[in-house]
Amino acid sequence: MHLRSTIALTALALVIAACAPSTSPPAASPVDSAAAGPRPSSSATLTVVSPTDGQSVAGPTVHVVISITGGTVVAATTIAIRPDEGHIHLYVDNNLVSMNYGMTLDQAVPAGTHVMRAEFVAADHVPFNPRVVTPDVVFTVAP
């Protein structure tokens, strides 16, 4: 009987510990490192060339084309933070789906209506201040 009580109390303690709020900070993401210091600004402008707003595309792969003016997309190995150099982050339905080092990408997107935007971020994957983001592009992927 003593063994059962010990096991039951141990199980109860584990359940309580699992339900308690975490005291450790969440894992750092690229955006979290922005607090480390002031962010540079960038005069670059970004445009989603394809798909276009309101377009219906055959799925499940969407050919994405991005255009940038006043900035250069650099390789992943670049670490210097410059206002005219960085990477492209692509979001579909508010989810980061790609950290791209080029201007074109074939992205798997399920059938349905979706919202896409792209962001030009510094070489450390942290946004410029102010952010360099395209307007939302609403498109539909046909099955």
Residue ranges of model-derived segments:
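Bacterial N-terminal signal peptides that target proteins for export
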Residues: 1-9
